């Protein structure tokens, strides 16, 4: 159980309609993300193991070779959020998919590896995004922000945290979902995996655009993904569909790999630049 209420990263950053939660414990953690998207986009494909030069990785696919959520054998996890509160520079044509960002970075073996790839990367012609990275060996959480012209970053403490966003209103999403989460942290099993699943399936305040499990006419939570990192194992669970139906259907797709030993790392840079 996590004793302290987590931090919130809502309207300060904006982003894709989603809820992202990280629950930290020493050099382990659990992490969950609701992917809220236009229904016409479809649920995508379940996680698979991907072999890179630097590391094994697990992630679901959006159907076009991209992803929004991934982890690797070193326990690093990345989550991508569209940054909708920042207006892209209209003089540029945005033709490159943000879904390609994580696959280009996820074989990084450390925070310094990932920094090196970022420094060599070119995000030109990509719409604004935020990338949240969790690094258990370093006990650090980082957030990179691309506004379509410049890349910035923010370092967070190693503590439990939520991110809320909505294309309708980041402020209202943070207010409504944040209130639900603050209440949930008083529950006896707060911080557990079962608690996290129930939280991300919540309709507290009635199903709608600002409930954690989103329901709108043309947009809803299309899938739920989770990562569990322990000293010896990396596990990703994934459910295609609204999280509110998980309890009835009980079809969470789960896949796991062994956690690599950081003491055996060679000096190397993780990925090729984007």
What residue ranges belong to the model's regions?
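Intrinsically disordered, low-complexity polyampholyte segments enriched for Lys and acidic residues
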Residues: 4-7
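N-terminal nucleophile
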Residues: 13-274
């Amino acid at each position: 159980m996590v004793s302290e209420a987590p931090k919130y990263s809502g309207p300060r950053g904006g982003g894709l309609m989603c809820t992202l939660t990280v629950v930290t414990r020493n050099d382990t953690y659990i992490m969950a993300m609701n992917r809220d998207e236009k229904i016409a986009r479809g649920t995508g494909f379940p996680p698979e193991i991907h072999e890179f030069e630097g590391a094994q990785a697990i992630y679901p696919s959006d159907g076009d070779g991209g992803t929004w959520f991934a982890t690797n054998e070193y326990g690093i996890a990345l989550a991508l959020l569209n940054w909708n509160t920042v207006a892209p520079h209209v003089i540029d044509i945005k033709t490159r998919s943000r879904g390609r960002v994580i696959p280009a970075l996820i074989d990084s073996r450390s925070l310094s590896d990932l920094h090196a790839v970022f420094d060599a990367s070119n995000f030109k012609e990509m719409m604004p995004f935020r990338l949240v990275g969790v690094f258990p060996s370093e006990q650090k959480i980082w957030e990179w922000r691309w506004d379509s012209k410049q890349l910035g970053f923010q370092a967070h403490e190693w503590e439990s945290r939520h991110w809320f966003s909505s294309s309708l209103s980041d402020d209202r999403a943070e207010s409504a979902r944040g209130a639900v989460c603050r209440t949930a942290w008083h529950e006896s099993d707060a911080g557990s995996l079962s608690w996290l699943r129930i939280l991300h399936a919540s309709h507290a305040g009635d199903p709608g655009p600002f409930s954690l499990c989103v329901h709108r006419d043309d947009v809803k939570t299309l899938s739920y993904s989770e990562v569990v990192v322990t000293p010896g194992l990396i596990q990703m669970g994934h459910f295609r569909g609204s999280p509110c139906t998980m309890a009835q259907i009980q079809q969470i797709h789960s896949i796991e790999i062994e956690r690599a030993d950081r003491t055996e790392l060679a000096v190397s840079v993780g990925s090729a630049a984007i």
